[in-house]
UniProtKB/Swiss-Prot annotation:
GO function terms (MF aspect): ribosomal large subunit binding
Transmembrane segments: none
CC terms in the record's Gene Ontology section: cytoplasm
Protein known as: Ribosome-recycling factor
Annotated region described as Disordered, given as residue ranges: 135-156
Intracellular or extracellular location(s): Cytoplasm
Function: Responsible for the release of ribosomes from messenger RNA at the termination of protein biosynthesis. May increase the efficiency of translation by recycling ribosomes from one round of translation to another.
Source organism: Bdellovibrio bacteriovorus (strain ATCC 15356 / DSM 50701 / NCIMB 9529 / HD100)
Phylogenetic placement of the source organism: Bacteria, Pseudomonadati, Bdellovibrionota, Bdellovibrionia, Bdellovibrionales
Cytoplasm recorded as keyword: yes
Length: 186
């Protein structure tokens, strides 16, 4: 394996960590209605658990509510049950044609808890990025030991890997900071 491959693998792992962080943070709710909040809801559609977005149209008429219009009125009850079973803490209002969801206001205490949760998720992402760096540096040391690359090339590769690591940690911090700001903003 060449140094370029080691760098590429490390960068791919870090990229994957950043994407994973973004997905994880989508699940942490802010005080505003965002369609991504409902991504985890699975509806029993003719015996098959299907994502809510595939069985209904989801819109946000205002910042604090959802309007869910199923493609088939027959599955309205199933959608309602799926929402109740989810851990969103929202009570669906079924009028026979559509379901309305009100996003409850977050208390100050809940906002702080969510901000702590964001920090914890971000720290896990930082650790994953550092582990990718460590794995890459171990590969470089192995290449040096096997005399596949010179010591100077190894040092340069480690410096490049460190630079990529620093960039990804900055990106992780930026994503987490944006989410925290969204949570703490009333």
């Amino acid at each position: 394996m060449a140094i370029a491959d080691v760098k590429k693998n490390a960068q791919a792992k870090m990229e994957k960590t950043l994407n994973s962080l973004s997905e994880e943070l989508k699940k942490v709710r802010t005080g505003r209605a965002q369609v991504s909040m409902l991504d985890g809801i699975r509806v029993n559609y003719y015996g098959t658990p299907s994502p809510l977005s595939q069985v209904a149209s989801i819109s946000t008429p205002d910042a604090k509510s959802f309007l869910i219009a199923p493609w088939e009125v027959a599955i309205l009850k199933d959608i309602e049950q799926a929402i109740i079973k989810s851990e969103l803490g929202m009570a669906p209002m079924n009028d026979g044609k559509v379901i309305r969801l009100k996003v409850p206001d977050l208390t100050e205490e809940r906002r702080k808890d969510l901000a702590k949760q964001v920090k914890k998720i971000a720290e896990e992402a930082r650790v994953a990025v550092r582990m990718a760096r460590r794995d890459a540096n171990d590969e470089v040391k192995k290449l040096q030991k096997d005399k596949a690359v010179s010591e100077d090339e190894g040092k340069k590769a480690e410096a490049d890997i460190q630079k990529v690591t620093d960039d990804f940690i900055k990106k992780v911090d930026q994503v987490a900071e944006e989410k925290e700001k969204a949570i703490l903003t009333i």
